[in-house]
Amino acid sequence: MPAPEQASLVEEGQPQTRQEAASTGPGMEPETTATTILASVKEQELQFQRLTRELEVERQIVASQLERCRLGAESPSIASTSSTEKSFPWRSTDVPNTGVSKPRVSDAVQPNNYLIRTEPEQGTLYSPEQTSLHESEGSLGNSRSSTQMNSYSDSGYQEAGSFHNSQNVSKADNRQQHSFIGSTNNHVVRNSRAEGQTLVQPSVANRAMRRVSSVPSRAQSPSYVISTGVSPSRGSLRTSLGSGFGSPSVTDPRPLNPSAYSSTTLPAARAASPYSQRPASPTAIRRIGSVTSRQTSNPNGPTPQYQTTARVGSPLTLTDAQTRVASPSQGQVGSSSPKRSGMTAVPQHLGPSLQRTVHDMEQFGQQQYDIYERMVPPRPDSLTGLRSSYASQHSQLGQDLRSAVSPDLHITPIYEGRTYYSPVYRSPNHGTVELQGSQTALYRTGSVGIGNLQRTSSQRSTLTYQRNNYALNTTATYAEPYRPIQYRVQECNYNRLQHAVPADDGTTRSPSIDSIQKDPREFAWRDPELPEVIHMLQHQFPSVQANAAAYLQHLCFGDNKVKMEVCRLGGIKHLVDLLDHRVLEVQKNACGALRNLVFGKSTDENKIAMKNVGGIPALLRLLRKSIDAEVRELVTGVLWNLSSCDAVKMTIIRDALSTLTNTVIVPHSGWNNSSFDDDHKIKFQTSLVLRNTTGCLRNLSSAGEEARKQMRSCEGLVDSLLYVIHTCVNTSDYDSKTVENCVCTLRNLSYRLELEVPQARLLGLNELDDLLGKESPSKDSEPSCWGKKKKKKKRTPQEDQWDGVGPIPGLSKSPKGVEMLWHPSVVKPYLTLLAESSNPATLEGSAGSLQNLSAGNWKFAAYIRAAVRKEKGLPILVELLRMDNDRVVSSVATALRNMALDVRNKELIGKYAMRDLVNRLPGGNGPSVLSDETMAAICCALHEVTSKNMENAKALADSGGIEKLVNITKGRGDRSSLKVVKAAAQVLNTLWQYRDLRSIYKKDGWNQNHFITPVSTLERDRFKSHPSLSTTNQQMSPIIQSVGSTSSSPALLGIRDPRSEYDRTQPPMQYYNSQGDATHKGLYPGSSKPSPIYISSYSSPAREQNRRLQHQQLYYSQDDSNRKNFDAYRLYLQSPHSYEDPYFDDRVHFPASTDYSTQYGLKSTTNYVDFYSTKRPSYRAEQYPGSPDSWV
C-alpha cells in the first residue's frame, strides 16, 4: 500500500511537468544566448555522428533478425522478443553518464530544468521526481513494495483506516491540455477523470501500420509504452505522442495518427509504424518487434554485437530518420535498444512529408533511463512474473508460437501479474483484439487502481471490441464496461468503436502471442467480481492480500448488500485469518474491511459470523502485540461495532473485558500514572483508541445484570472511567465523545446497585434510616422481622443520616473500585457536566446517573440526594427542563422526581421548579411538544412533589397545572397515550385529597369530576386512541361486562395472575403500545371472560391487597359494576392524616410500608435508566420488587 504521503509527492510533480510541457511549445522565447545554443548544436552534431555509425550497424542486424523471424513465423509480421539476460548499453563506457545539453536555435528552446544526456542514453526528459511515472509504492510496474493490485490503482488506499469512498477519488485537478503542433494537433488531455485516463485525438487515418506484437515483461520494463507513445503511468498523461518512452510533449511538425490508447497493463502495442510501409503499397502490413538484447553484467558497457528492431520514436532513431527514415520509401529503420531489457518503443504515424529535426532528439532525455537506473529487481511479493490464469504461457499453443517467432529468446508476457491463481478468472472463450488493415485495437485507458475507483455507473462506458477465439480469425463483437473514455474522431475513416472494418487489401494477419494468450477483457478496465476479490485474500503475495482487503473495505462502505454477500461468500473468515498476518499493511486493511463489514444495525449476521470464526480472540491478539497506533485504533473500532449486537456482547465481556481494561482503559486514562503531564493530557484527549474502547464498554454495559456485575468487578475499570471524567472536567473538555461514552457507561453501571452489588447491600440495606422524613418501619435490628417491634436507642444524626455536611457515615476510608459508583463524591463531576456540557448525550447520561443513584430506599441513595442539594445541583437540573431535547428533559424530570424523595429537596423543588414542570405539560405557549415518555416523567415528578406537601399542591394549582392535567385526562386537544393519561390522573387525584384546597379548586371552576376520572373513561379513551385494536378485544373489554363490584376487582385488590408477567424480551418502554397493551391476558375472579387489557405493575400484591381492602370504598360505590379491572390506575389512595392540622407536623407519622410508588401504581423497574446500547435491555417488573422510587 502506498504511504499517505505518496499522493502529495505525485501532486508535487504534476505542476512541474505541466511547466515542462508548456515550455516546449514553438512560441517560447529563447532563454539562452545564441552562443550557448550554437555550442550545444555542435556538441549534439558530434554525438549524432557517432550515433549514426552505431545505428547503421544496428540496422543491418535488425534487418537480418526481422527477415529470419518473419520467415519463421510464416506471416507478414515478426514478433518482438524481450531479453533474458542482457540489454544493450545505449552509451559507451568512455562517455560520462550525464551532461547538460544546450538548447538549439533551430527549434523551441528547452528550459533549463531539462538535464539532457549528451550520449546515446538520451531517452526521456523527465525523472521520477518530476512526474508520477516513478516506481514507488503503488505504481505499476516493478514497484518496490508491490502492495498495489495491478488491476486497480497506482495510488491505492491512501489511508487504510478510512472507509470513505471519497478518499480514493481520482485527483481531478483539471490539468492543462498539451497541444502538439503539426499539420494537425493531437491532444493528450488530463481532465478530472481518474488517474491515467488519457484523451487522444486522431488526425490522420488509413495509415498502414506495423504491429509491435509483444511488450516485454513488467519485471523488466518499468515504463513500457504502447501505440502512440503515451506513457502508461499516471504522470505519463502529460507526455508526447511522439515519444517512444513517454516523454513530455515536444514540438512535432508532423501529422500524428495515434491508433490506440495507452495502457499500463497492455501486453503489446497494437500499432503500426509508418516506417514499415511504402507509399506504393500502403496495405503492406508488417510486424515490428522490439527485439532487445541480453542483459550484460555491465549496463554501461560497450554495444553488443547485435542490435534490435527499429525503435520508432526513440531518440536514436531520429538522427537516422533525417537522412533515411524521412523518405516514405524507406522500409526499415535501425535503432538501438533500451538500456535495459523490456524497453519497448512505440511506432509513430508519420506523414510522407515529415522531416524530423534535431530537436526531436532532445525530447528523449535522461529521465526515462533515470527510472531504469533506479529500478531494482522485483521483490518476491510483487505481481511481476505471475502466471496468468487466462491462458498459461506454458500451453502447447503458446510454446509453439514462441518457438516460431522467437527461436532464441524467451518471451515473458508483460501482463502475467494481471491475474492470479484463481479459477474465477478463467474464461471459456479467450480472445484478443485483432484488427485488419490500418485498424488498431482500443485496449485500455487510464492507470488502473483501487485508489481512483469510484463505484458509480457514471465511471464506466461500454465499448465494443472484437474477440478472436484464440488463433482463429472468427470475430464477434463483444461489449465490455470500460472506464469512461473521452475522445474525438477527426476525419478518420475508421471507427474506434467498431473495429471490424476490413483491411485495405484484405490481408489476413496471424495473431500475436499475447493475442492468443490474453483475453481482451483482461486489458479493459473493469471492476473485479466480489468472489475474485475474496479469493485474492488467500493470495500468496501480501501486496495482493492487502489490496484485496482494502478494496473490500471500499466496496462495503455504506452498502449492506455487499456486506451480506461478503459474509455469504466466506470473506469474513479470510479477513479474520489476515489479522494474524506478519505484514502490517495487511493487518490494517483487514481490520478496515472488518470494521465496515460489521458496522450498522443491519449487520448482526456479520457480527455473529465474525464471532463464530474466532474474530474476537484474533482482534485481541493483534491488540496485545501491535504497537502501531493505527492498528490499535482499527481493532478497537471493530470491537466497538461488534459490541452493538446483543448476541456478541457477553462473548466480548468474557474474552475481551480484561484485555481492553488493562491494555487501553487504564494506560490511556492516566489513572495509574503518578504524574499526569500536559503531553499526556493532549494524548488522552485525542486518543481514538480510548474513544473506541469506551464506546465498546458503553454498549457492553447494557447487556444485562451479569454483564454489569462483571464490569463492576473488573479491577481498575470504574476507577479509570471516573478518572477520565475528572480529568476532562478539570481541562474543560466537556463535549468529547470519550466523556460521553464514560458517562453513559457509568450510568448503566449505576443501575440497581443496591440489589446487584453485595457491598452495597451490606453497606446500605441493613441500615434503614429516616432520611425520607419518616420513621423506619422496623425497630428491630433484623430487617426481615416485621411483626415484632423492639425499642432502640435514638441514633444521633451522625450515625444514621448524612445531610451533605461532615464525614459520610459508613465510609471511613477512601473509596475505590465499585464503591466509587455510589459514593457522594461522584455527584460533583456529574453536576459539572450538567452545567457546562453542550452535548445532549452527555447531559442525558449525567442526569441519568444521578437518577439511578438517587433511586431506592437504601442509605447511599439518600446520601446522593443530600449531596445534590449540597452541591447546588437542583437549580442545574431545573434549568435543563427548559431544553428543547426530549431525552434530556425526560432524564432530568425523572431525576427531579427521585430528588423529591428527600423532604427538603421536595420543598425546594415545589418552591422553585413547579412552574418549569408545569410549562412542559402540553398546552399553552410552552416549548415544543414532548414525547409520551417524557410527559409521563413530568407527571410523575409532579405527583411526587405534591405528595404529602400541601404547599406544593397549592403551587401547582396557582401555576395553571390543573387545567393542563384535566385536558390530558379528558382527551382534549392532542390525544395523549394511556400512559400519560394515567400519570396525569394520579396527580389530579393527589390534589383532590387536600380538603383545605378544594375551596380554591371550586373558585377556579373545578369540581370532583375533574379530579377523579372514572376508570371506564380511561378505557373508553384508550380504545379511541388505539383504533388498531381488534373488535374482538373490544367485545371482551370489561366495559361491556358485568363484574360484580369494584371490591372484587383483582386490579384494585392487587391480585395478579401468575402468568401475567412481561416477556423478558419486551423492552420496558414498549409496554403501552397498541399491541403490548393486549399482550398479557389472564382470567380474573368474578368474570367469565378474560380481560385483554390486563397490565401488570404490582411488585408486592399481598401487601397492596391488605392496604387496598381498607380503602376500597373511598371513591367507588358497591353497586358500580361497570368498572374496569385495570390495575395501573389506582384510586385507593390513603387520605392524608388530619388535614385540619398543620401538614408538616404529621409527615413523620407515615409508615414506610405505605411507599409511594406502589401506592400510586408506579412501575418499579423503569426508574433506573439503562439506555446506552443499540437495543435497550429488558427487565421484568418482578426483578426489582418493592422499589419505592420507580415511575410509571
Swiss-Prot record:
Superkingdom is Eukaryota
GO BP annotations listed: cell-cell adhesion; cell-cell junction assembly; cell-cell signaling; positive regulation of cytokinesis; regulation of cell adhesion; regulation of Rho protein signal transduction
| Residues modified as Phosphotyrosine | 372, 415, 478
Q: Can you say where the ARM repeats lie in this chain?
A: 415-455, 518-557, 560-599, 604-644, 660-702, 706-751, 815-855, 862-901, 950-993
Locate the coiled-coil region(s) and give their ranges: 36-70
Q: Does the keyword Magnesium apply?
A: no
Report the locations given in the UniProt record.
Answer: Cell junction, Desmosome; Cytoplasm, Cytoskeleton, Spindle; Midbody; Cell membrane
Biased amino acid composition, Basic and acidic residues: 773-782
Region annotation Disordered: residue ranges? 1-31, 73-262, 290-310, 323-348, 773-810, 1058-1086
The protein's matches in PROSITE patterns, at most eight in alphabetical order, are given as: ARM_REPEAT
Bias category Low complexity: which stretches? 231-242, 325-338
Omega-N-methylarginine: modified positions: 254, 270
Which tissues express it? Expressed in salivary glands (at protein level). Expressed in arrector pili muscle (at protein level).
Positions carrying Phosphoserine are 75, 106, 132, 136, 139, 221, 231, 236, 273, 281, 314, 327, 337, 392, 403, 406, 422, 427, 438, 510, 512, 515, 776, 1045, 1091, 1100, 1135
Tell me the InterPro entries matching this sequence.
ARM-like, ARM-type_fold, Armadillo, Plakophilin/d_Catenin
Per the record's keyword annotation, is Metal-binding included, yes or no? Answer: no
Q: What is its main location?
A: other
Biased region (Polar residues) positions are 77-86, 138-156, 163-204, 214-230, 1067-1077
Q: How does it sit in the membrane?
A: Peripheral membrane protein
Which Pfam families does the UniProt record give? Arm
Q: Which GO terms describe its cellular component?
A: adherens junction; cell junction; cell-cell junction; cornified envelope; cytoplasm; cytoplasmic side of plasma membrane; cytoskeleton; desmosome
- Family stated for the protein in its record: Belongs to the beta-catenin family.
Task: State the oligomer form and interacting partners.
Answer: Interacts with PDZD2. Interacts (via the C-terminus) with FRMPD2 (via the PDZ 2 domain). Interacts with RHOA; the interaction is detected at the midbody. Interacts with ECT2; the interaction is detected at the midbody. Interacts with CCDC85B.
Any idea what job this protein has?
Plays a role as a regulator of Rho activity during cytokinesis. May play a role in junctional plaques.
Write down what this protein is called: Plakophilin-4
Tell me the organism: Homo sapiens
Q: Which gene encodes it?
A: PKP4
